[in-house]
Swiss-Prot record:
Organism: Arabidopsis thaliana
Keywords: ATP-binding, Cell membrane, Developmental protein, Differentiation, Glycoprotein, Kinase, Leucine-rich repeat, Membrane, Nucleotide-binding, Phosphoprotein, Receptor, Repeat, Serine/threonine-protein kinase, Signal, Transferase, Transmembrane, Transmembrane helix
The enzyme's E.C. designation: 2.7.11.1
Pfam families for this protein: LRR_1, LRR_8, LRRNT_2, Pkinase
Residues annotated as catalytic: D817 (proton acceptor)
Signal peptide: 1-24
Binding site for ATP: I698, G699, K700, G701, G702, A703, G704, I705, V706, K720
Protein name listed in UniProt: Receptor protein kinase CLAVATA1
Record-annotated Protein kinase domain positions: 692-968
Modification sites for Phosphotyrosine: Y766, Y804, Y860, Y867
Positions of modified residues (Phosphothreonine): T868
One of the GO BP terms on file: peptidyl-serine autophosphorylation
Quaternary structure annotation from Swiss-Prot or TrEMBL: Self-interacts. Interacts with CRN; this interaction is direct. Interacts with CLV3 and CLE2 mature peptides (MCLV3 and CLE2p, respectively) via its extracellular leucine-rich repeat region.
GO molecular function, one term: protein serine/threonine kinase activity
Length: 980
């Protein structure tokens, strides 16, 4: 008997020794088969996964870990990146404890064979973006030990899997950033082990999930961002006593903030921004003793900031901007010892800022702009020398800027526009090492600017409309990167320092409406970066520098209303970039030069110069004391009269001959073509005219024809042929294009290179965009090639171009014809806003202007524009919202939805037709079917912005600056999860 048992044991030992290597080899086979379906960017990925005769060689493969029996227990190939699909053979790695395939580019559905991975504790397939289909809940049933399930940022759809409630050990669950629909299953409230719940941006809807309050171990909960709940913040959440992060931003919450949240003693982050919350901020929130970040911005909250906030001793960030809050900002805010960011712009706060604000020494950013605040600026804002951004614009602050701010070396941006501030500006403000912009326009500052100034990064100074006096200090020349200098409407006197025009990057200078004397420095002739110069309404004397024509890129020169003498330099005629010239009301004399750029300017450019001789005058005025070429007697001598009569008869004969020849020459050029350049061009007008051939036409429209022209220097240009001035018709946008594109420069606005013109025809010359218009690509046969990454980038870049027009141009510029066909794409698919034929300057940014007729394109026109003809920048915002919907849906704004229905109405109709509407459900219903592998979170984010832009009420639409901010700043919790 004993011998039989011994033989049996030996047999089992032999079988074990025989088959153990075999099992290890099987895992190697599985890995090598998996490798064949995981393709790297340059062919096969996982280069060290190579077959070997060694039974445990696979255990040294990158991303692979084994147990003592050489069985694979961990497979982590995240951030490789890999393409391809997840092979069903993954289910053969039955000893896997950790499967992490995050941050790759896997596509397709999850294989059901994964249900064999019964030992799995970690399953992380996040940030692939292209995993699709319904999430197969059945694979989870046997994963009884699963602790982490992360599917964030993929394309899963359908309902959330109800099987989650069976995972009794699950601690981390993220289904965020997918295309799910419907409600959160109530059974999710039974996953008692759960510590992290991420359902943000998942397209969920239904009632606000109060049942999640049963998750007593929960520490982080992200359930906002493009989910759409009915109801408000569940009061029951006050029972989640271990909760550290509650993020319900942007999920259509209504009602008031529940006071029960004050029970969350461990909560350090509360994000409820971008909702429709009403009522007051509960004073009970001061019970959140661990709170560090509070964001309640962009809601409809009213009332005052609670005094009890003094108890929030750990808070670092308070964002309350864009609400309806009022009253005084309490002293308690200044008492908060760790406060770093305080943003309350666009509210109705009154009275003074807390005098103790910043005294804690930690303040980094303060933005209280667009309120009704008054009083003095607190002196301790930068006590800790950490303050970086100080924005106090559009209030009623008075008194001086505290001297202490002049010592704040951490400051990077100072914007204190439109207040009642007075006194002298601290000298130190102009010597701060990190400041990039100083904007003090529209106040009552007085005194002289400091004699000593310096700063390596300062690029913008705006001191317009104050009471500054004294001389302009030469020390301004110590700002090597200065680009913009606005000193207009002050009381400066003395000369313009030559050092200013020696700055290597100066592009715009305005010293108009001062008491400046002396001459224009000769150094202006060497300032090649200048684009705009306004020295008007001063007492500048002397002559115009002869070398002014060396400033090749100068587009605007206004030196009117001075005491300039001498003749106009003929070299100005060679300044092909110069589109605006104003020399009026000086003491210039001699003849206005003929030809060149002088053909562009009209008589108003030279008005008010008594002794200046305009080209059409036969005789020129002379100064008192000067003698004419002939005395009075000679003028009326008999011989003179005879000669005059003969000349008159001869002239009549010549005129009659000319009239008879007119019809013969009607089809010939009425004037020689003239090229006017806005930058240095290496071709001539003849080169442009050679390209006006039928085979070069690339587009036709109501304003004319567009040709592609190949210049001798191998540069392609786009030539837009307009109906000209001589036909009696309108100029079809010629003036608007010249006045706008001729004076602005921006990366995302198409460059106007110049124009060629004669009496009958205008030819506008643009940089050529080889990829055509967004409209052509989006709605043509190539639309499918515009994947989401490109579409999103185009949206951001076009928004930046429009933002520049609305917020960085003075006066602001309205485009008035924003549409996909007017967004052009260069060889890198970079977007450029184009076609300014309907553009309009709006002098007062807060006003609107009434137009005589509707401008714009059907399907893009804002509703208020159609029936009031009043236009402001929000009209452009509406049109841009339509473009965003085009990018999402891939459909034209009109013509595809039935009579009288445009894309905006179609989207709203679609929402009404969905049984359980949510942002995700709407996006799924309208998204361009040609898009593949698009990230749900990003598309919904853009969709939300689009719907804000196309609000019926203009006041409800965001500004383009806000649009750019939203497009370029994904929700905070989403951004953090992406970096997982």
């Amino acid at each position: 008997m004993a011998m039989r048992l011994l033989k049996t044991h030996l047999l089992f030992l032999h079988l074990y020794l025989f088959f153990s290597p075999c099992f290890a080899y099987t895992d190697m086979e599985v890995l090598l088969n998996l490798k064949s379906s995981m393709i790297g960017p340059k062919g096969h990925g996982l280069h060290d996964w190579i077959h070997s005769s060694s039974p445990d060689a696979h255990c040294s493969f990158s991303g692979v870990s084994c147990d003592d029996d050489a069985r694979v227990i961990s497979l982590n190939v995240s951030f490789t990146p890999l393409f391809g699909t997840i092979s069903p053979e993954i289910g053969m790695l039955t000893h896997l404890v950790n499967l992490t395939l995050a941050a790759n580019n896997f596509t397709g559905e999850l294989p059901l064979e994964m249900k064999s991975l019964t030992s799995l504790k970690v399953l992380n397939i996040s940030n692939n973006g292209n995993l699709t289909g319904t999430f197969p809940g059945e694979i989870l049933k046997a994963m009884v030990d699963l602790e982490v399930l992360d599917t964030y940022n993929n394309n899963f759809n359908g309902k959330l899997p109800p099987e989650m409630s069976e995972l009794k050990k699950l601690k981390y669950l993220s289904f965020g950033g997918n295309f799910f629909s419907g409600e959160i299953p109530e059974s999710y409230g039974d996953i008692q082990s759960l510590e992290y719940l991420g359902l943000n941006g998942a397209g969920l809807s239904g009632k606000s999930p109060a049942f999640l309050s049963r998750l007593k171990n929960l520490r982080e909960m992200y359930i906002g961002y493009y989910n759409s709940y009915t109801g408000g913040v569940p009061p029951e959440f006050g029972g989640l006593t271990k909760l550290e992060i509650l993020d319900m931003a942007s999920c259509t919450l209504t009602g008031e903030i529940p006071t029960s949240l004050s029970n969350l003693k461990h909560l350090h982050t509360l994000f409820l921004h971008i909702n429709n919350l009403t009522g007051h901020i509960p004073p009970e929130l001061s019970g959140l003793v661990s709170l560090k970040s509070l964001d309640l911005s962009i809601n409809q909250l009213t009332g005052e900031i609670p005094q009890s906030f003094i108890n929030l001793g750990n808070i670092t960030l308070i964002n309350l901007f864009r609400n309806n809050l009022y009253g005084q900002i309490p002293e308690a805010i200044g008492e908060l010892p760790k406060l770093e960011v305080f943003e309350v712009w666009e509210n109705n706060f009154t009275l003074q800022l807390p005098a103790n604000l910043g005294r804690n020494g930690n303040l980094i950013k303060l933005d209280v702009s667009d309120n009704h605040l008054t009083g003095l600026i607190p002196k301790d804002l930068c006590r800790g020398e950490k303050l970086e951004m100080l924005i106090l614009s559009n209030n009623f602050f008075f008194g001086p800027i505290p001297e202490e701010l002049g010592k704040c070396k951490s400051l990077t941006k100072i914007r204190i526009v439109k207040n009642l501030l007075n006194g002298t500006v601290p000298a130190g403000l102009f010597n701060l090492p990190l400041v990039t912009i100083i904007e003090l326009t529209d106040n009552f500052f007085s005194g002289e600017l400091p004699v000593t100034m310096s700063g390596d990064v300062l690029d913008q100074i705006y001191l317009s409309n104050n009471w500054f006096s004294g001389e302009i200090p030469p020390a301004i020349g110590n700002f090597p990167n200065l680009q913009t200098l606005f000193l207009d409407r002050n009381r400066f006197r003395g000369n313009i320092p030559r050092e200013i025009f020696e700055l290597k990057h100066l592009s715009r200078i305005n010293t108009s409406a001062n008491n400046i004397t002396g001459g224009i420095p000769d150094s202006i002739s060497r300032c090649s970066t200048l684009i705009s110069v306004d020295l008007s309404r001063n007492r500048i004397n002397g002559e115009i520098p002869k070398g002014i024509n060396n400033v090749k890129n100068l587009g605007t020169l206004n030196i009117s209303g001075n005491q300039l003498t001498g003749s106009i330099p003929t070299g100005i005629g060679n300044m092909t970039s110069l589109t605006t010239l104003d020399l009026s009301f000086n003491d210039l004399s001699g003849r206005v030069p003929l030809g060149g750029q002088f053909l562009v300017f009209n008589e108003t450019s030279f008005a008010g110069n008594t002794y200046l001789c305009l080209p059409h005058r036969v005789s020129c005025p002379t100064r008192p004391g000067q003698t004419s070429d002939h005395n009075h007697t000679a003028l009326f001598s008999p011989s003179r009269i005879v000669i005059t009569v003969i000349a008159a008869i001869t002239g009549l004969i010549l005129i009659s001959v000319a009239i008879r020849q007119m019809n013969k020459k009607k089809n010939q050029k009425s004037l020689a073509w003239k090229l006017t350049a806005f930058q240095k061009l290496d071709f001539k007008s003849e080169d442009v005219l050679e390209c006006l051939k039928e085979e070069n036409i690339i587009g036709k429209g109501g304003a004319g024809i567009v040709y592609r022209g190949s210049m001798p220097n191998n540069v392609d240009v786009a030539i837009k042929r307009l109906v000209g001035r001589g036909t009696g018709r309108s100029d079809h946008g010629f003036t608007a294009e010249i006045q706008t594109l001729g004076r602005i420069r921006h990366r995302h606005i198409v460059r106007l290179l110049g124009y060629v013109a004669n009496k009958d025809t205008n030819l506008l010359l643009y940089e050529y965009m080889p990829n055509g218009s967004l409209g052509e690509l989006l709605h043509g046969s190539k639309g499918g090639h515009l994947q989401w990454e490109t579409r999103h980038r185009v949206a951001v870049e076009a928004a930046k171009g429009l933002c520049y027009l609305h917020h960085d141009c003075s006066p602001l510029i309205l485009h008035r014809d924003v549409k996909s066909n007017n967004i052009l794409l260069d060889s890198d698919f970079e977007a450029h806003v184009a076609d300014f034929g309907l553009a309009k300057f709006l002098v007062d940014g807060a006003a609107s202007e009434c137009m005589s007729s509707i401008a714009g394109s059907y399907g893009y026109i804002a509703p208020e524009y159609a029936y009031t003809l009043k236009v402001d920048e929000k009209s452009d915002v509406y049109s841009f919202g339509v473009v965003l919907l085009e990018l999402i849906a891939g459909k034209k704004p009109v013509g595809e939805f039935g009579e009288g229905v445009d894309i905006v109405r179609w989207v709203r109709n679609t929402e009404e037709e969905i049984t359980q509407p949510s942002d995700a459900a709407i996006v799924v219903a309208i998204v361009d079917p040609r898009l593949t592998g698009y990230p749900l979170t990003s598309v919904i984010h853009v969709f939300k912005i689009a719907m804000m832009c196309v609000e019926e009420e203009a006041a409800a639409r965001p500004t383009m600056r806000e649009v750019v901010h939203m497009l370029t700043n994904p929700p905070k919790s989403v951004a953090n999860l992406i970096a997982f």
